[in-house]
Structures are given as structure tokens and as C-alpha cells.
Amino acid sequence: MKGINVCRSIAGVIGTASLTTLVWGNCPSGLLALNAITQADAPTAVSENNSSLAPLESSVTATSSTPAPAFQDTELISLVPHQGPENRLAVTLRVNQIPVVTFLGTATELAALSNDQVTDTMERAQTVARRLDELSGAEFFDPSTIKVGLDATTRQLVVKSEDEILLTINKNTVLPEKKLSAPETALQTANRLRRLLGGAEPIVALPAALQVARVNTFDAAATIKRIKGGIASWYGPGFHGRRTANGERFNQNALTAAHRTLPFGTRVKVTNLRNGQSVVVRINDRGPFTGGRVIDLSAGAARAIGIHSSGVGNVALDIVQ
């Protein structure tokens, strides 16, 4: 697999119907504007939308991790960073030059990226792009295995292949051309990937149970009580696929966490006090074992609240239903 070269220096500004796109230098010319999305992607009146992703990891918790190398654009998969709504960073993932899904970040991340700084949103997009590139080159990959499902832990809609979560649908994972409901976003994202990665037939409609899923689990979660917050860290590479303390396989991109005392299965809303971003995680491991830290998040959860790049962050913790 080739690495993904995310173009860095700002080369110019172009306009689109819905946003102004900042184009980073040394990009292939085909990346200079968002392609029109054909109506063939939508088998019904439903549209497509956004993302966040999940593989497997495990038991011993760590206080830091080595980030994966930056993804380099391939002939099939590419990433286009640009200015999104409200001057936020947006990173659009393309397959065969067709925009599939956009990852939304913050205005601070947009400024950081123009200064060559690594951002959580870019890392999240690179993780998805890297895995799609791997799947597309696998000998026995079948694009018809790409479907929409429901994460049993977070109750969020996901796009998956077989039992592997490729990305999670949330408020910061949207369709490039417009923002739709979570079910519509999930359906169109899955159908675009099915078609562009191998010409599989579209999914006509989602089961009724998936059509009412919420975009943000924590919005619907009722707080039972606030517990002691403090410094959160994260762990991932090196533990992926290993057994957690409760016996399951650790998935670094799933929304899970390690806590010293909370019962396994407890759902905890973790809020980054610096930026207000929240995520609901499920406790499936023990830790952290470094003094002064109260919770150890999976890599996916750390990205969701913006502490992946910094390694640690000050958080509030609430037990939720």
C-alpha cells in the first residue's frame, strides 16, 4: 500500500456552491475542486453522509502511542483538506476522484494544518483512508460486504465491512455536498463505497431500526451522576487485537476506555474541557496506571474529543444510561 500524501502548503483558493476550498500545494490537479456527486449513488430519495472509524485492540494500557505514518494519496484513495463551514477544517475523502465523505474539525485545526501541524481530524481521515486502501488491494475483498450497522456499545450508526467498523456516523462526519440525517448519511456513504470500490449493487433501504438511530449518542444519554474527572490519556497501536481486562479484543478505533474501578460495561460521557467536545465510551479495560490520570481512552475516542495529537487532556466524566 502506498502512503497518503496530504498536500500541505496553501496553493490557492477556489469556490464551490457551498464552501470555499483551500487547496494545499503539490496536489494532483484532480483534487482542486469537489466533483459533482451523481444521483446514481442514491437508490431512493435518501442521501449520504459522514464518519469515524473502528478496528480492534487490547489489554495493558499505555500512556502514549506512536502515530501511524501520514497517508499518501494513491490512484484510488485521496484526501482533500479545505475550509469547511464556520471556518472549520474539513477533510474530504475521495475514491476515484469522487467525494465520498467529509470529516469536520475546528477553526483552530484549520490554522494548524496550514502551519504543517498534525491535527486529530486529519489523523481520523487518514485512518479511514488507509484502511480503505488496504481493503481495495486485498485479494478476496468483496465490496458487497460494506453495509450499515449499529455499534452495540455507542448505539451510533456505522459503515462496516463484515464485522469491521470502517467509520462511525456522527455530527463531524458528513456528506461533502450537504448535511443529512445520520441514517441518510450512513446509507449514501455505504453505497458510494460499494460502487466505487468494486461496483456492488446499492443498498435500497435501511431496516426500520436503523432509520431512527441518533447522530450523537451522548445527546440522548441521560446522565446518572458525575464522577471525578482529571487528566485523560489514550492508547492504541501495540495493543490492537490483544485481550482487554474483560476478555474481549481491543479495538483502538472503537469508543472504549480503561478505568481503574468502574464496572465493565459502564457507559461514560467524556468531555474535553478545552473544546467542549464529548464522546460516550464503554469501559472494557483497567487503567491508567500512570499517576494523575483518571481514564485511558481508545485512539478512536481520543480523536473524537481532540486529544489524540496532544496525548492528554483535562476531561469531565459522567456516567450515563
From Swiss-Prot:
Pfam families: DPBB_1. Coiled coil: none annotated. Keywords: Cell wall biogenesis/degradation, Lyase. Its EC number is 4.2.2.-. One of its GO terms (biological process) is cell wall organization. It comes from the Bacteria. The keyword Cell wall biogenesis/degradation applies. GO terms for molecular function: lytic endotransglycosylase activity. HAMAP family: RlpA. Belongs to the RlpA family. Lytic transglycosylase with a strong preference for naked glycan strands that lack stem peptides. This is Probable endolytic peptidoglycan transglycosylase RlpA. It comes from Synechocystis sp. (strain ATCC 27184 / PCC 6803 / Kazusa). The lineage of its organism: Bacteria, Bacillati, Cyanobacteriota, Cyanophyceae, Synechococcales. The gene is rlpA.
